């Protein structure tokens, strides 16, 4: 019996030791919640963390899955453009293109969700290239703020010959441009300088936001992503609400929530590359009548948008941090997150000292 108790005591001590070790790790762990409207770049940011602070490369299984998703992205985006061209009444540069339309439009949403294999994709790849090179599709694409289409489609259309090769193996850059809506909650842990950083990525569509409240405990910081180039676009859910207005409304709810009174909230004004392309072509004054700067200057537009979000904060004493980012640019994210990481660790140390 004594021997039995001895073994039991040893097991208890081992369990307690493991629990103590686990609690120590949990106290050091930085929990970052990624929030923002759909298509703001949250999942792309997580991919960058994998590249910069994780394995650096994706596994063979992950790459195979991304390859199928890239095929799906290209077909899906061209279906959207073909439908929009028809609705906008834009005539084909080459009338013969019309006979090819059904070869792309035949794919149903169900087909795309099931996945597109190489054999299927290679049949339509030349047709997609021909469509993309037709002036009618280019004119339609120039009016993309009028309909819902992925920002990454141009990248894939321009790389169709490479993507359609039998030995196509997606690069990290291809994977960064690949789009798949986040459903539910996904968690990713990366050890950075011996400190575990836990990233919680939550779907940004309206239907997914009720799940945000499941993630609100033990949060160190919130990284709130905004697609800054979307000032002339409307959301998918109602096709009326301006996307930046929607993002600001969500940000206002989060930044003024009492649950986050001790949580640092960092604003990422993302898709800066696309904003720079858009500003000379799309006058922000048509969508925000209170804009008073030079509508042709990217910097004026950037700070107008930042001010919109900054003004929604009720607690003016709280520090306000923001960064202009391009989530598909690895060096930009490496540099920005280095700065963000230091400010988060500093704030976390202050919080621990107060406990």
UniProtKB/Swiss-Prot annotation:
Region G1 motif, annotated ranges: 31-44
A Pfam family annotated for this UniProt entry: G-alpha
Sequence segments annotated as region (G4 motif): 266-273
Region span, G5 motif: 325-330
GO MF, one example: GTPase activity
Family, as annotated: Belongs to the G-alpha family.
Name the UniProt record assigns to this protein: Guanine nucleotide-binding protein alpha-12 subunit
Organism field: Caenorhabditis elegans
